[in-house]
């Protein structure tokens, strides 16, 4: 095996665990707000659970609980969808320095809402 191949394999072996660790979120109840398009911010909680390869997120706001789908945790982003009233909404939240997430949620009609999530204490 050539030295350059060995070096590349070594670098990848070190980088892979770091990238996997960066994709973890703290399980538990996160707090924050949901701001619908043209609406006021609503206090919310977000129940985040992981078991093996399964990730679940439940949004609780305005007396309703909605399960998220298509959840993807990346190093710097959290992506998911949810369907309030049957209309699909796609969210892209960015991880902040304080480990919170915030970002936009877009519906099929082009309406934009905002979600902020702060990790459990």
Question: What is each stretch, according to the model?
Answer:
Residues 9-18:
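Bacterial N-terminal signal peptides
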Residues 1-10:
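Bacterial N-terminal signal peptides that target proteins for export
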Residues 24-121:
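Central antiparallel beta-sheet cores of small beta-barrel/beta-sandwich binding domains
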């Amino acid at each position: 095996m050539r030295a350059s191949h060995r070096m590349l394999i070594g670098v990848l072996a070190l980088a892979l665990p770091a990238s996997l660790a960066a994709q973890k979120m703290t399980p538990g109840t996160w707090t924050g707000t949901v701001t619908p398009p043209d609406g006021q911010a609503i206090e919310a909680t977000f129940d985040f659970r992981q078991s093996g390869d399964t990730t679940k997120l439940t949004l609780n706001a305005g007396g309703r609980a909605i399960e998220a789908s298509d959840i993807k945790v990346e190093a710097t982003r959290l992506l998911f969808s949810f369907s309030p009233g049957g209309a699909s909404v796609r969210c892209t939240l960015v991880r902040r320095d304080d480990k919170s997430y915030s970002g936009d949620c877009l519906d099929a009609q082009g309406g934009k809402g905002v979600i902020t999530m702060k990790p459990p204490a």
